[in-house]
Curated annotation (Swiss-Prot):
Classification via SUPFAM superfamilies: Viral glycoprotein ectodomain-like (SSF161008)
PTM notes: A proteolytic cleavage by host furin generates two subunits that remain linked by disulfide bonds.
Main location: virion
UniProt biased composition (Pro residues): 71-95
Name assigned to this protein: Envelope glycoprotein B
Residues carrying covalently attached carbohydrate according to the record: N105, N153, N442, N484, N637, N703
Lineage, uppermost ranks: Viruses, Duplodnaviria, Heunggongvirae, Peploviricota, Herviviricetes
Residue ranges annotated as motif Internalization motif: 917-920
Segments on the Virion surface side according to the record's topology features: 63-803
Summary of the function given for this chain in its UniProt record: Envelope glycoprotein that forms spikes at the surface of virion envelope. Essential for the initial attachment to heparan sulfate moieties of the host cell surface proteoglycans. Involved in fusion of viral and cellular membranes leading to virus entry into the host cell. Following initial binding to its host receptors, membrane fusion is mediated by the fusion machinery composed at least of gB and the heterodimer gH/gL. May be involved in the fusion between the virion envelope and the outer nuclear membrane during virion egress.
Disulfide bonding pattern of the chain: C128-C606, C145-C562, C219-C283, C376-C424, C627-C662
Membrane topology: Single-pass type I membrane protein
Amino acid sequence: MAARGGAERAAGAGDGRRGQRRHLRPGRVLAALRGPAAPGAGGARAALAAALLWATWALLLAAPAAGRPATTPPAPPPEEAASPAPPASPSPPGPDGDDAASPDNSTDVRAALRLAQAAGENSRFFVCPPPSGATVVRLAPARPCPEYGLGRNYTEGIGVIYKENIAPYTFKAIIYYKNVIVTTTWAGSTYAAITNQYTDRVPVGMGEITDLVDKKWRCLSKAEYLRSGRKVVAFDRDDDPWEAPLKPARLSAPGVRGWHTTDDVYTALGSAGLYRTGTSVNCIVEEVEARSVYPYDSFALSTGDIIYMSPFYGLREGAHREHTSYSPERFQQIEGYYKRDMATGRRLKEPVSRNFLRTQHVTVAWDWVPKRKNVCSLAKWREADEMLRDESRGNFRFTARSLSATFVSDSHTFALQNVPLSDCVIEEAEAAVERVYRERYNGTHVLSGSLETYLARGGFVVAFRPMLSNELAKLYLQELARSNGTLEGLFAAAAPKPGPRRARRPRRLRPAPGRGQRARRRRHAGGRVTTVSLAEFAALQFTHDHTRTSEHHVHRLASPWCLLQNKERALWAEAAKLNPSAAASAALDRRAAARMLGDAMAVTYCHELGEGRCSSRTRMRAPGGVCYSRRGSFFGNESEPVEGQLGEDNELLPGRELVEPCTANHKRYFRFGADYVYYENYAYVRRVPLAELEVISTFVDLNLTVLEDREFLPLEVYTRAELADTGLLDYSEIQRRNQLHELRFYDIDRVVKTDGNMAIMRGLANFFQGLGAVGQAVGTVVLGAAGAALSTVSGIASFIANPFGALATGLLVLAGLVAAFLAYRYISRLRSNPMKALYPITTRALKDDPGRNRPGEEEEEFDAAKLEQAREMIKYMSLVSAVERQEHKAKKSNKAARLLATRLTQLALRRRAPPEYQQLPMADVGGA
């Protein structure tokens, strides 16, 4: 049986060219083709000997081995037993041996690495019977490989992405108006009530603004306006008009500035029981914020007023075609108008075009500016300093790795001229591209072509500027120079105007745009670009493209791999002719023996031999002056060993046909079980462990990252502030402004005290002033006296209003009540018993007289005449007593009125006739 090594057996008579071909095998074609070899075609004698040996080997394997210990290898033949025993091969130190503590740690590491590499080696022995042709195989033909394109057209560049501009156009405006407050009051005896109050906002006339407000920083204190279809004139404080100076508002807040003439609400009070109306006129100038949204046909003020006129309406540069809802008489545009600085009150030096519009309630003034230079329907969203454009299915895909987003558009450029108010895009995008190029690509790339714009899905406009690396640009220039054959062509190609031509493969014909693409073009042909508020679809598209890119990497590997397999099939066919057993073992992934049967291959599988049933010879010299090219071995049972040779990879070959001429300095390593054995000069030297041999691997690792790791960034098309600032009116600003209005232009902390006396005095003064000079003189005297009286009354009222004065007044009232009660009792007693009331002591003495009603005396009867005289006398005496008492009090108090009354009483008594009575005898009086 032929061996698998590099030597051959001794040539027989019938070998021919087949033996020579096997002798010229040049080693291994591929490392994966290692495997057992099949015997070649030998002579008749060799074939017969091989058949006999294989029959013997089959009988030995089939015989039962029970009762025969096979643990020891079979003994060598007698001629080989006298040979010296091979020296014991040193075994490598174990991990716990003495060598582990040696200082040479590198040796231990290398040994451990070799042991780890040798752990996967196969130490089993195989016996391969010769293929008989029962199993015939053939190599599979080449397979068709999947077609994979070379890739799409990729263009590197710088991109600027634009979105719909939803932010309103804001500007400063000045409003002029007069706040007219009319208050109606009714005055009672001790109080006043407001029965009605209304407020009107009156626009300031344009002539008053230009000639008085913006020129002198003053304002008239009267207002003329229409109310209910009637012309009404209102005067501040119901007084003659005058030029009131403007003063800053009481409250200063960011973005809130205003000026006014008064902070008082005039309230007039009339006489008791009458109605009175008072008017206050407050001239107010406010700086407000104005907002206008697309299509800019109106604008709103921060006060809540909406002006139905475009902020770009004017009388020049075609601005008269802008929208307006007011009559021409209400609008006025002044060229070269000098504004006044609201903070300092000084006139500015730069003239402007000033618009004035008088509405129903306010007069609005703002600076006119051209429309196309100040508003843009698109706003810059993001800048992509590294953008890649590629073609896919007739569309362009713009991938920005810095945004983790991919935008898909048509393959045709988008004409921005069809989008209204989009002039800012080209200018702003070119400036951004130039800035990015200077900062990052100035030394490595060159710009190629001009700025291109594309309308991406979702309403995004992509401004893309292609560029080339310097190396690629040089290659293109060299190609153009070779194609032109002159230096002029090179210089012409280097000129920046035409730009370098891209050396790409012929571009495929683009498919005609579909119905959806045509619809999108018609929709954006003359209208505004509308952008979605979410950009997750761009991130999903980027994820899809990222995954497809990884898939394309696999496809690019699969297609060349298939082509490589088809090419290697020819190598397999040739390897099968050189070593069919090795080729069959590698193809079948199993140890097999094979031989070629023309264009087919006969295959038979090898069988594994148990452990301890194989031994080897120590010498490799054969009789006849030749040597064995493979070491000899014995395998099988101990009683009937089979003599053969050790082939490659522990394959046992029956027979000893592999010989070679003996050479000097012979050194060979043969695989034997789990280790190698070393022979020198055809004699056994020692056993070599696998760890002592360095490993040369022919295996190429495939380190393939199928899906690259990416971090996705959140895409926020519109910020929260932009979404909150989209409307025409900012209701929070309007509410804030309305709540601050009273604090800014009126004093809410001042208390106005109403004085009715002053109202009376003012009324009297107005009355006497209407009578002329004489009336004014008389009025001065009367008003002086009335003022003194009012002061007295006010003093008394103030005294009573004081707590101590109220207590004193209460005590006086109580004392007066007690005195009145006592006087009433005195008068009552006087009426009932005058004598007792007038002479209480005399009557008490008469009552207590002991001589009255003596026992034994009779009571005398009263004389009627005497009784009447006594009564007259008592009456006269009472009058005299009263006169004396009154005279005494008058002298004591020195009052003229009382003295006068006393004299009159005395005169009355003197004129009275003498009393008509008779003198009584003394006996009647005292009893003497």
